[in-house]
Amino acid sequence: VEAVQDAGVVVTGAGGGIGAALARRFAAEGARVVVNDLDADRARAVAEEIGGIAVPGDASRIVEEARDALGGTVDVYCANAGLGSGGTEAAPEEVWANAWDVNVMAHVRAAHALIPAWLERGSGRFVSTVSAAGLLSMIGAAPYSVTKHGAYAFAEWLSLTYRHRGLKVHAICPQGVRTDMLTAAGSAGELVLAPTAVAPEAVADALFEGIAEDRFLILPHPEVAAYYQARAADPDRWMTNMNHLQQKWEADA
């Protein structure tokens, strides 16, 4: 994809899973890639593999260091680091706060650091790894579902606010992806996500198709579009069907 050749790219949460697949694909397309992960060893391993630059640490705090590593300019920022927090309304406030911080506020902080320069030069690309849970909700995972809705809303807001000023925004909303996060989703993940789970590389493929077509919403599982339309057309019917899944999950527990 010509749009990313020689671009300076940052991918957070890129020590494995979707992030590593994105980093590999950007590097294969000729981009210069900063690989970020909280796990410094994993970040360095992926960076070494793809000829990138490892900048480990909290995704919220590395924009300046990543920009310096790329020679002063970030062209593409992939806000990919995420927290798959399960639980109900009774989850401890710390769980809710951590999910909000990683899944939403890290995106806000990155945008705050990057957008002034992007607007000044009239170009920039912000990629948000959201989730189908940001469109549809996920059983057994209130903090995750709520904060992924927030991540989607922020990406949407960025796009509708700045698209006429050269900012490209992409929101990736996959269902199940074969990563550690799917394993951590436990029985709810096995019921809802595992049957149609795709490889992380399929998510990267979907993003690059979306970049080529200049599309905001990236759906590695195309059927999610129909689910989203069904939810909008008849919310009560949609939630009744989701509640049937909830009851099946409870019965199987």
Predicted regions, residues:
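Conserved glycine-rich cofactor-binding loop
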Residues: G8, G15-G16
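Active-site-adjacent segment of SDR/Rossmann-fold oxidoreductases
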Residues: E29, L136, W157-K168
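Conserved amphipathic alpha-helix within the SDR
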Residues: A47, G51-G72
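Conserved mid-core segment of classical short-chain dehydrogenase/reductases
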Residues: G82-A97, E120, G140-P143
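Active-site helix of classical SDR
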Residues: A111, T147
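Residue(s) in the substrate-gating loop at a strand-loop-helix junction
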Residues: S131
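C-terminal helical subdomain
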Residues: A171, S187-Y227
